[in-house]
Amino acid sequence: MSAKEIIFSTEVRDRLLRGVELLNNAVKVTLGPKGRNVVIDRSYGAPRITKDGVSVAKEIELEDKFENMGAQMVREVASKTNDLAGDGTTTATVLAASIFREGAKLVAAGMNPMDLKRGIDLAVTAVLAEIKLRATKVNSSSEIAQVGTIAANGDASVGEMIAGAMEKVGNEGVITVEEARTADTELDVVEGMQFDRGYLSPYFVTNAEKMRVELDDPYILIHEKKLGNLQTMLPILEAVVQSGKPLLIISEDVEGEALTTLVVNKLRGGLKIAAVKSPGFGDRRKAMLQDIAVLTAGQMISEDIGIKLENVTLDMLGRARRVLIEKDTTTIIDGSGDKASIQACISQIKAQIEETTSDYDKEKLQERLAKLTGGVAVIRVGGATELEVKEKKDRIDDALNATRAAVEEGIVAGGGVALLRAKSALASLTGENPEITAGIAIVRKALEAPIRQIADNAGVEGSIVIGKLVDSSDQNQGFDAQTETYVDMIKAGIVDPAKVVRTALRDAGSIAALLITAEAMVADIPEKNAAQNAGNGAMGGRGY
């Protein structure tokens, strides 16, 4: 075990604070509509230019181990806020730095850090409740567009695109952001259920111009295992031919003789048919097949539940209004599934999402949920250069996350105004002793930090802005940094999701309070420079 360096009390807080301030100084410049860009070096390729706070925070690693611990703890605030709310990372960083800075001063002046922490916790709880009270629900598409526009740094086209996507696929529908191959940013909405498996043979194609299979009002055979020969399938194939309807086969695979026979029948015109592989792998494949069965009012054909292929009848097959199959995707449009059955399946998946602790499982369950609840919208981000596309994609990701948060918990006045106005919750709050009251005062001062930083980034003196807003009786009045005017933030459409503001404050208060109560730090002693020792040769130990 390597030797350790241990530091105590004042030195602990000094070193932590230096690390916190270094990270905060790099992140805070991105806050607000006039926030600046940060250029991040890459080990290969062009540097990355971003205005996304969490992207900047994640890149910061300091040489001094003790300073680095401070930076990493505040970086954790940004990451956690991003994970929970999807936005507000810069606000969380600015709040955490402000609370710790003021707290460290008071501890250095002789106050009890544990009482300061109690005061901070009391104040944060009161402010969180106040913000929740001030939140108003998001109802209209225009309000959703406003939230998206603000989070995308005033880009109205992004806000409108996100609002359009949510309108099409529903609030729980999947909206993905991808890099486009053109210069334009566009929204592509996939109605119904889509999964990433295409036709097994191009001979199944019915629309040669678009190279896709189009099946109208088809039967859908959902089979768990591979199909190697068609002997067992003959009864159901004959029944489908007599019905005059097309047939889609979804199974683990269709190979050899079975695939050849299907293709020959299709080419002869005897049977309009197509086959695709099942989506997913392992147990997840079985679950997705079950979802397709529920959506199309069919049965999954599986020997596990005692159904053999030779015994399958037409009423066991799924139905849909239309199926489109391209090279890599299959889209089932308007399945015949019973609404109550689909809702029961949705409720079951939601319960599994609540119970699971694995991020990967949660993501896959959410994909299943989205496929059942309302299709998929894809925002394809275009730009003149790769750098521009990546920067824009960051902003759209932020905007999308902020919009989801707004739908969940409502909106409050943006631009730091909600935090500033929530100070009213602390007006009559006092602690059991002066040190707890001092902890409350730390939070009261920190609530001004985001609006001060937004003003500073716009080149305006933050203290003057705060003074004017405090004097105003209009609770929604704030500073529009874009136009450098004082406006009603709600009417001007400058809003923040309540969830983002609350998550930022809660996480910042939690980490900053822990930093204040740190009294000792332990880190490995850096190893001596190997190159220097090699240069000293046999006398490498000289000077010890």
Swiss-Prot record:
The keyword Isomerase applies. GO terms for cellular component: cytoplasm. Gene3D superfamilies: GroEL (3.50.7.10), GroEL-like equatorial domain (1.10.560.10), TCP-1-like chaperonin intermediate domain (3.30.260.10). InterPro entries: Chaperonin_Cpn60_CS, Cpn60/GroEL, Cpn60/GroEL/TCP-1, GroEL-like_apical_dom_sf, GROEL-like_equatorial_sf, TCP-1-like_intermed_sf. Pfam families: Cpn60_TCP1. One of its GO terms (molecular function) is ATP binding. Its main location: cytoplasm. Keywords: ATP-binding, Chaperone, Cytoplasm, Isomerase, Nucleotide-binding, Plasmid. It is found in: Cytoplasm. Signal peptide: none annotated. ATP binds at T30, L31, G32, P33, K51, D87, G88, T89, T90, T91, G415, D496. Its EC number is 5.6.1.7. Forms a cylinder of 14 subunits composed of two heptameric rings stacked back-to-back. Interacts with the co-chaperonin GroES. Together with its co-chaperonin GroES, plays an essential role in assisting protein folding. The GroEL-GroES system forms a nano-cage that allows encapsulation of the non-native substrate proteins and provides a physical environment optimized to promote and accelerate protein folding. This is Chaperonin GroEL 4. It comes from Sinorhizobium medicae (strain WSM419) (Ensifer medicae). The lineage of its organism: Bacteria, Pseudomonadati, Pseudomonadota, Alphaproteobacteria, Hyphomicrobiales. The gene is groEL4.
